[in-house]
């Protein structure tokens, strides 16, 4: 059948195993007010840049997220260390599906992050991803042609 861009898929939130450290790919979604099940977009995603956070900022963020998600939520030491050293967007943890991460090309991600944006935080000039490869859990790339000619 025909698929539409607004179709969604069930959330697959696996925090703290997967969290919003710098470089992860996560599924966009509509807000909780219209999407209480936190269903993920099938076609829209984002790549996290965020910022490094100190312990005080992480504590404050953890408390805000706990008020939203419940007392079960906390940042394990390993997650805290990643946010202190690499950075990310911890306020999104536990509420969005994380499904991958950048394995090379962080300098490209940084250049995209520095692109001038408009009042809606959208790039003034389109930024297009021209080539991407799927890499399995074993670290090997799926070398099938994805419709793009090199």
Please provide the spans of the model-predicted regions.
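Cyclophilin-like peptidyl-prolyl cis-trans isomerases
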Residues: 1-150
